[in-house]
């Protein structure tokens, strides 16, 4: 006589200790490898906004050197970590140090009688070359209080604890640089002497409109975020076109003639 066996609920298929997705449908192995979830972001599949500009991390730090003899700006050169450590011995000059429209709290470091309007880092580099001071021009670096005027200059004043040139301290050098800036005021033509990338070819320099209550210069390099030539902000001053709404045609009123009898 056949026997009836009771099946415990623990042996139900819904109480397995393994995921059903781990079962190998091909029956070649008892258990298939567990699938690892992957996160795919939509922005990873999109093309870069500016493909000609390398992403951060794909290129090392680069600097532009000024030839002390000819005064010409050499091509941008990538620097190794060893060279970068040597550059830390250089002191830094920012354009806002010489800006007459700024107070000392806003970044000015020279006396007001020596300050100038619209100072540029390229002119500061020209002054250091004229003063026979070893300098490095960094066109992309900015001061936190003057982010709209990119560019700074590294100068070597001391070597092994001794003066590297005739200027023993930074204050003395800045005084002579300020005199050079006064003799060479900034104009729109000065912007053509700054090295730019291919994105700025054909862009004519122009003064930017000043914003009331905001500290800024009217003559800044073309790659400044304040200019209309910058790829990211070139349309910031363009007023959007106002589209006039279409006139709605009113439906004619129904007129009734009342006839009295």
Curated annotation (Swiss-Prot):
Gene3D superfamilies noted in UniProt: Signal recognition particle, SRP19-like subunit
Pfam families xref list: SRP19 (PF01922)
Protein localization: Cytoplasm
InterPro entries tied to this protein: Signal_recog_particle_SRP19, SRP19-like_sf
Purpose: Signal-recognition-particle assembly has a crucial role in targeting secretory proteins to the rough endoplasmic reticulum membrane. It must be involved intimately in the translocation of a wide variety of protein substrates.
Record-stated family: Belongs to the SRP19 family.
Known partners and oligomeric status: Fungal signal recognition particle consists of a 7S RNA molecule (scR1) and at least six protein subunits: SRP72, SRP68, SRP54, SEC65, SRP21 and SRP14.
Listed name of the protein: Signal recognition particle SEC65 subunit
